[in-house]
Structure formats: C-alpha cells, structure tokens
C-alpha cells in the first residue's frame, strides 16, 4: 500500500482483504473446499476431509509468514511453499489426512481461487461505496437542479 496515497484511495476494510494474512486465509479456505468436494464424490476419504477442515480452522495462526515470504521468492509463487506448510500443519495432527492436502489440484488452482475470493469480498465494500456515491450525487442533483453554474475543473473555467 502506498503511504502517500493511503488517505486518498484506500479503504481499511478493502486493504485488509488484500493483506498477506487474508490471502493465506483464502488459500486455506480453497484447500478446505477442495477436500470437502473431493470427499463428497469419493475422491478422498471423508475422514481426511473432516480432519483437513478441522485442522485448517486454526492453521492461519501456525503459518510462518517469514519463512513463507522467503520460500515464495525461491519457488516463484506462494502456492508451493504454502501447501508444504499446510501439509506439515495437518500432518502434526493427522498423518493420513496430510496425504490428501491439495490432492489433484494445481498451485494455480488454489492461488486463482483465493484471489477470486478476495475480489468477491472486496466487491461487497466497493458496491457499498458506489451506492453511497450514487445517493450523494442524486441528493446534490435534486437539491441544485435549478441552480445555474459554470463548468470548471481545479484551475480553470470551462
């Protein structure tokens, strides 16, 4: 985030949605959804999906973001080192379930899904801001509908 423009262009709620922690949370959410969907159709054992879901609920607090940042630079994307950390976290509690973390998915699948989840969450805030702008503009247009005024920009009359 640009500190120079922070007070002009950023909304704290939206900025938080695009934080590193939020991205990893959405990646965890994608991995959980993948495991649950695969269990529903018999691709992985239901017990593995349940274990992955339960363990993932607190996994964000166990992710080492410093290690993840360095490994992301070495790997070329966040997904590969993320999956290694998530798998290790699941393995601490359920070695069998750890085998099914990220089963059949590509790194890009998880990263793309997480990014779309971020965008969806941000759009909730953006839509509310657009509605607020619309209501304000409508109020101003109604209030000053009969007011004659010249057009202008910051420095000159148009």
Language-model regions, residue ranges each:
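A helix-coil-helix interface module used to build multimeric assemblies
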Residues: 1-156
